[in-house]
Amino acid sequence: MTVIAKIYAREILDSRGNPTLEAEVTLENAVCGRAAVPSGASTGTKEAVELRDGDKTRYLGKGVRAAVDNVNGVIAAALVGFDGADQTGLDHRLINLDGTENKGRLGANALLGVSLATAHAVAAARKQPLWMYLSTLGESKLSLPVPMMNIINGGAHADNNVDFQEFMVLPVGFASFSEALRAGTEIFHALKSVLKGQGLSTAVGDEGGFAPDFRSNVEALDAILEAIGRAGYIAGEDVLLGLDVASSEFRNNGKYNLVGENKRLTSEQFVDFLDDLVAQYPIISIEDGLAEDDWVGWKQLTERIGHKVQLVGDDLFVTNPKVFQEGITSGIANAILIKLNQIGTLTETLESIAMAHRAQYAAIVSHRSGETEDTSIADIAVATTATQIKTGSLCRSDRVAKYNQLLRIEQALGVGARYAGRDAFVSLKS
């Protein structure tokens, strides 16, 4: 029933108007699964390779015809007749078929599209929603994740002068995901009013957050605090704050260059800067606080505030189990961001989440800045031991689609639905 009969890929557009790959896997019983692959703007140097054509006369060189051809050719030839229910076996066959450490021959976008589409197909064949099927593939908790809502965009995600890439609200003080989502939405709309009142732009960035020209990163935090209050919530109780510093993007010649603050800081000084922010604001999570190659700085940051703040490795770990294990062994960070296209298969993604759970690191399932209407990450966040999800702001359909899928899952779980809330950070001490 779950033997693969056909594999097909096509070139579609992502939320930035760039080409990406969509794969379809059809089983012998004619059931079909479909998945689309996202794309990042700020990327870690150790990420799996996203295969682009490089033909400047077509889509400015960003076409993915080669990856599509790889799916329709060598990958389809190798997997037609394979039992899609053997997800681990299928993914290992994909990895071996590529034969490179970084999936650079066939492309991580080609491999991931097929890997995810197969899971969708098998779930449909079993008449199960994806989250229910995925819960049978590994460690599972079936709880609704805390949304890390990116309501102000900066850095590589916006054309403004804000250094930090994301300013997020985390609605932790609520009994259900739906209530948390409502709170985040109301704060988002309150923030729009705050920005208008300050004469600032309410245009949005790649991930749906506002992208005004604040004079500093601290100004952005102050605006969010005002919005939380205007919406009728209490910062530090109902809602906590999160940052994606994406510091690799503004580190040059060993110094962290903060344009708004007019500062060029050493690693030690930047650790002090982040520590001061945590003391002044109800910040519970900092992602990529130090550059991906600044492991000495990461160690200092972890020792300084890792007991009370979630320190998330994104560019640092790139969802790669080998790199992640080095970080665990070294005592670097205490959480990992899970981006499927950083590693390239569903099995490796689930392995990274399971590794985090065993090491008592938090796992956050994440979108990319170039997204599609695909909602797979919502199902993965519910089905695994991940406690949080990053899928952007409260506008743009490519972001809201994931939130809406989580609402559907919460309703499907009924009285058994559990929202992670503050329990997502139970290992941290105030």
Curated annotation (Swiss-Prot):
InterPro entries: Enolase, Enolase-like_C_sf, Enolase-like_N, Enolase_C, Enolase_CS, Enolase_N. GO terms for biological process: glycolytic process. Binds a second Mg(2+) ion via substrate during catalysis. It catalyses: (2R)-2-phosphoglycerate = phosphoenolpyruvate + H2O. Its EC number is 4.2.1.11. Coiled coil: none annotated. Mg(2+) binds at D244, E287, D314. PROSITE patterns: ENOLASE. It is an enzyme of class 4 (lyase). The active site is at E207 (proton donor), K339 (proton acceptor). One of its GO terms (molecular function) is phosphopyruvate hydratase activity. The keyword Nuclease does not apply. One of its GO terms (cellular component) is cell surface. The keyword Secreted applies. Pathway: Carbohydrate degradation; glycolysis; pyruvate from D-glyceraldehyde 3-phosphate: step 4/5. Its cofactor is Mg(2+). It is found in: Cytoplasm; Secreted; Cell surface. Keywords: Cytoplasm, Glycolysis, Lyase, Magnesium, Metal-binding, Secreted. (2R)-2-phosphoglycerate binds at Q165, K339, R368, S369, K390. Component of the RNA degradosome, a multiprotein complex involved in RNA processing and mRNA degradation. Catalyzes the reversible conversion of 2-phosphoglycerate (2-PG) into phosphoenolpyruvate (PEP). It is essential for the degradation of carbohydrates via glycolysis. Belongs to the enolase family. This is Enolase.
